[in-house]
């Protein structure tokens, strides 16, 4: 396929705005899967993803489209995680694209996640096609959404495509918009190989499978490759594309998206965002944007029955095969027995792992309260990171503690401003911005300690606004805070698993609430 006939794009949207349904309809419209074989949300493989209506891992599918200009095109549609916990994964998937379909619900309008995802797309200088979905609903107001696109997002609304993914309305027009408005990939086949690794997972039969986008050069079966972040070298055994079923090919050329198999035994030998090049004739420098995905939320997982300890360990080991951002280490509690200290990208990530263990491995769990990672600055200027409050007593010569802060964006109906402000004030929030998106809807931005939102902030926000508020956040930095360690005694005995780090002004109330439980 000629390079100028390739279109690589992603669909980004707030949760429940119809991203997966739209992906399904595009697959149907290009006859990639016969309708009788189609199941809803074909790109969402994991049962949990389908059930929750979210995408956890990036998926990709290659679609053929015969356009009105008489030419045949290849669409590489890269489905991305839509949740804040997986922001880095989203950014790497977007780096494999030249454009995005920005889906907005015609009945709900712009939400916090819409803005967060758009900002990621703008950082990658991607072409943006606004897609106003659910126009078949009686409460749909496409003209109002167009105003929002221009006023709030500063996006030209004249090229917005009106669709109903559920009813299949506007799908042909959308595919023509992809041809016209999303540029073909740049790059040169004669250059040294530069391939972006944007996802990887473990296959029981073939080892680790890697999703790549060829940014420069080309890649053939039998060639030796090198991972630039780790220096690991492998021989390419198989290349292919998802159509959406796996289809082998002899090579991947510049601009193409596909998978590779290279006898990679462990997932941690691959890093999402890494650059793959030839080992014998490597490129001069890696692609920009790579960083290690680090756990931000930590919790203890203990089997309710001590007999399940080995099963839990096996379950955690298997989960890390497909999730390199998840970490665990054995720990012992005097009250809870043997368990594991686990690290997650965020609260949703933690919930998904816990649910998978209980559902797939049949282990009933007791989960300790989630905590964030803290920074200790010692009197001699050293910096230490701790993820477990019980480790604080081991540290000597502490000068001060620092905690992570996030920038939170809340979009809420005007009548609930007071409720939101009271909640955020209680969580030590600092207001940075307040903007009316229209007379009825307000955007609020706050700097908040991450520790204040990991427990029940989202639930309290939703219940206080009758479900109308949307919330998103991004990590900013670590800041010095007046933090203390709270220990819990049960019948005079210290229960280390219940220890927590809290702000001095709130430690009494948190201790009282714990005692009530």
Which residues does each PLM region occupy?
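Structural and coupling elements of P-loop NTPases
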Residues: 1-517
């Amino acid at each position: 396929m000629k390079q100028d006939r390739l279109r690589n794009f992603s669909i980004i949207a707030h949760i429940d705005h119809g991203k997966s349904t739209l992906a399904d309809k595009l697959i149907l419209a290009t006859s990639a899967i016969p309708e009788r074989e189609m199941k809803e949300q074909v790109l969402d493989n994991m049962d949990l993803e389908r059930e929750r209506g979210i995408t956890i891992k990036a998926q990709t599918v290659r679609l053929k489209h015969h356009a009105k200009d008489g030419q045949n095109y290849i669409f590489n549609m890269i489905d991305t995680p839509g949740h804040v916990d997986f922001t880095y994964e989203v950014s790497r998937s977007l780096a494999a694209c030249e454009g995005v379909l920005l889906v907005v619900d015609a009945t709900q309008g712009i939400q916090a996640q819409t803005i967060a995802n758009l900002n990621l797309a703008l950082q990658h200088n991607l072409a943006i096609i606004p897609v106003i979905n659910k126009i078949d609903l009686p409460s749909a107001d496409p003209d109002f959404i167009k105003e929002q696109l221009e006023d709030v997002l500063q996006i030209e609304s004249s090229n917005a495509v009106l669709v109903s993914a559920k009813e299949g309305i506007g799908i042909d027009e959308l595919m023509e918009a992809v041809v016209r408005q999303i540029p073909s990939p740049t790059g040169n086949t004669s250059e040294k190989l530069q391939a972006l690794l944007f996802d990887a997972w473990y296959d029981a039969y073939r080892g680790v499978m890697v999703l790549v986008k060829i940014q420069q050069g080309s890649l053939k079966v039998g060639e030796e490759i090198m991972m630039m972040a780790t220096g690991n070298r492998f021989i390419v055994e198989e290349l292919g594309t998802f159509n959406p079923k796996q289809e082998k090919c002899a090579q991947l050329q510049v601009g193409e998206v596909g998978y590779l198999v290279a006898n990679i035994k462990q997932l941690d030998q691959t890093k999402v965002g890494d650059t793959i090049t030839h080992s014998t004739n490597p490129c001069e420098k890696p692609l920009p944007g790579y960083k290690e995905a680090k756990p931000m939320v930590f919790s203890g997982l203990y089997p309710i029955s001590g007999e399940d300890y080995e099963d839990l360990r096996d379950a955690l080991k298997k989960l890390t095969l497909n999730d390199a951002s998840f970490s665990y280490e054995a720990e012992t509690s005097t009250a809870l027995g043997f368990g594991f200290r686990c690290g997650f990208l965020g609260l949703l990530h933690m919930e998904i792992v816990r649910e998978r263990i209980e559902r797939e491995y049949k282990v009933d769990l007791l989960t300790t309260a989630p905590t964030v990672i803290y920074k200790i600055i010692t009197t001699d200027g050293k910096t230490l990171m701790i993820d477990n409050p019980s480790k604080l007593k081991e540290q000597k010569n502490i000068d001060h503690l620092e905690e992570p802060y996030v920038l939170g964006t809340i979009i809420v109906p005007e009548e609930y401003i007071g409720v939101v402000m009271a909640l955020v004030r209680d969580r030590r929030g600092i207001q940075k911005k307040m903007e009316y998106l229209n007379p009825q809807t307000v955007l609020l931005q706050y700097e908040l300690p991450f520790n204040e939102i990991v427990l029940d902030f989202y639930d309290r926000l939703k219940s206080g606004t009758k479900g109308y508020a949307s919330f998103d956040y991004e990590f900013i930095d670590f800041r010095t805070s007046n933090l203390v360690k709270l220990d819990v005694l049960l019948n005079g005995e210290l229960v280390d698993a219940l220890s927590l780090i809290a702000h001095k002004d709130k430690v009494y109330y948190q201790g009282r609430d714990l005692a009530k439980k």
